[in-house]
Amino acid sequence: MHRRDFLKLTAALGAATSLPLWSRAALAADFSPLPIPPLLQPDANGKINLNIQTGSVVWLPSTATQTWGYNGNLLGPAIRLQRGKAVTIDITNALPEATTVHWHGLEIPGEVDGGPQALIQPGAKRQVTFAVEQPAATCWFHPHTHSKTGHQVAMGLGGLVLIDDSDSETLPLPKQWGVDDIPVILQDKLLDKHGQVDYQLDVMTAAVGWFGDRMLTNGVPYPQQITPRGWVRLRLLNGCNARSLNLALSDGRPMYVIASDGGLLAEPVVVRELPILMGERFEVLVDTRDGQSLDLVTLPVTQMGMTLAPFDQPLPVLRIQPSLAIGSQVLPESLVVIPELADVTGVQERWFQLMMDPKLDMLGMQALVARYGMKAMAGMNMNHGDMGAMDHGNRPDMSQGKMKGMDHGTMNGAPAFNFSHANRINGKAFSMTEPAFDAKQGKYEKWTISGEGDMMLHPFHVHGTQFRILTENGKPPAEHRRGWKDIVRVEGARSEILVRFNYLAPASTPYMAHCHLLEHEDTGMMLGFTVSA
């Protein structure tokens, strides 16, 4: 964050905290409380019921927005699982369309992973049973319906999975759910003039992703969480379809990162800014012992489409209000043992070239600028990709961000461009029936994922594993990204990861590897692969 932005935020915050107590109470009353997802744990028989259903939420005055949720109107419960124990989940689909439930971050066999082949038809049920054999972590579950994932997530489907183990239970970490152990699911939303979720998969969103003009935290705009005075644990999930975030605290105090996607780090890592990609999770500790209220804010990012108001300046997403109660006073010096990286000499290597059809690149950028103006380009010029030397600076019809008479799907009367397979890996769009390769169970592989020649942001996710990042976008990984991960950043350069698959995945239910910008995934930037013994 630029110093001037911090000063602005700090001044605003200071004005609020200098108010007399009675008006501070009135100010607090203006905040909605942060909704805390209910904990859902296996019953005495090791079972959990999950109902995928329609619902409604009031985000705008006098308007009910139609939404989808798991066991409720929106989002879902936090499913709490224990390492070493099996669970059986009975899933019922009460939606009007088919869906799947993918267990993002869980190391489980392909047949229960919930990829696009594992469709649950409307009115149908599916039962999955698996044992949890991985370290404590914050994971999540969400749809993975081919070509429909972006829409189904935008409608509200998503929930947390909390894995506990002996390390997480014995370490002196905040553990009171909804008190000092706080889930923070961040998602942007776009509503139409009728107050309904305005989701379109078109040439623009296929190129840059679907993005909103408001931010929700656990489904509520800018809520407040009252916490004890002490160390507070935030379990952060970027649940956005396409928007990367960069989180900070409004008064500039540090956050201590204690866990990434796949579990606890070796020791807390101090950061003042925390970039978090779509689908990623981080756990951070925040020191509230001084009793001062503060905001979790998302800072501006340089990503196409994501620079528009209100995201063009620091945007508060959660007010943290310490009470008089005394909370955890301990910051652990060390957490868990992270194994040394395995020797990659002689291991199987694979190459993944992420690419967008140049025509989609061109049409998508044109549609973005036509709809939102040059500000949406995040500082990139218009010859990004294949747009040649178009000089938009002096075009009279571009001055107001309009391109007169342009149909976003057609150019010069040509047939509409079919973008449904325009995003690819190694030149191929996703196939539901042809896995791209077979990996061997328990064997390390080194994967290189390249975004060279494509300046788009691609958070690359691999099913069925927690991997280690060797290099990220051409550089050594940041310290807090050196633990267990299931998403790596690819943006115009190469990333290298060390993967290993402990379970089998047959051709009927292969694992997926894909871009977690959901509209890229839905338009082909995904492949299936098998794991055999």
UniProtKB/Swiss-Prot annotation:
UniProt lineage: Bacteria, Pseudomonadati, Pseudomonadota, Gammaproteobacteria, Enterobacterales
EC number: 1.16.3.4
Native species: Yersinia pestis
EC category name: oxidoreductase
Modification(s) after translation: Predicted to be exported by the Tat system. The position of the signal peptide cleavage has not been experimentally proven.
Binding site for Cu cation 3: 144, 463, 514
PANTHER family in UniProt: BILIRUBIN OXIDASE, CUPREDOXIN SUPERFAMILY PROTEIN
Keywords assigned: Copper, Metal-binding, Oxidoreductase, Periplasm, Repeat, Signal
Keyword Metal-binding: yes
Name of this protein: Multicopper oxidase CueO
Gene for this chain: cueO
SUPFAM superfamilies: Cupredoxins
